[in-house]
């Protein structure tokens, strides 16, 4: 086993068995228990189409329910960098489009956005792009 953590307010334990292999052990209190999981992907945090309010509602509900959060990836678009041929000033949220430190701003803002939910995250995948 590589690592193991037990978030203080969750009914599960996440163990990292290998770099890309995790197990989640859920501690059921009875035979008729319910466990919640928020499965998400493609949040594209820096996209103007990313609904931060909806994401916050879902993440808040996950915390309230003690849910495991699994993010399959593509947390960022990151297509508005100086050297990216796909970049377009219309495809970037205004708070990230105003300065030369776009990548740092996106990563720091996303880290701040997700930090309150970190104890419930099982993993965050890389995504497909």
For the regions a protein language model found, what residue spans apply to each?
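Short glycine- and acidic-rich boundary segments immediately preceding or forming the N-terminal edge
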Residues: 1-27
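Core catalytic region of metal-dependent phosphoesterases/phosphodiesterases
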Residues: 5, 31-34, 40, 45-129
């Amino acid at each position: 086993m590589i690592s193991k953590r037990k978030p203080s307010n969750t009914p599960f334990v996440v163990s990292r068995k290998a770099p890309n292999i995790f197990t989640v052990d859920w501690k059921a209190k009875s035979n008729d228990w319910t466990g919640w999981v928020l499965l998400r992907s493609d949040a594209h945090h820096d996209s103007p189409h990313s609904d931060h309010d909806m994401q916050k509602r879902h993440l808040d509900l996950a915390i309230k329910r003690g849910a495991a959060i699994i993010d399959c990836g593509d947390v960022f678009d990151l297509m508005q960098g100086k050297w990216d041929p796909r970049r377009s000033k219309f495809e970037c949220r205004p708070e990230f489009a105003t300065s030369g430190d776009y990548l740092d701003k996106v990563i720091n803002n996303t880290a701040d956005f997700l930090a309150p939910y970190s104890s419930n995250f099982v993993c965050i995948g890389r995504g497909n792009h």
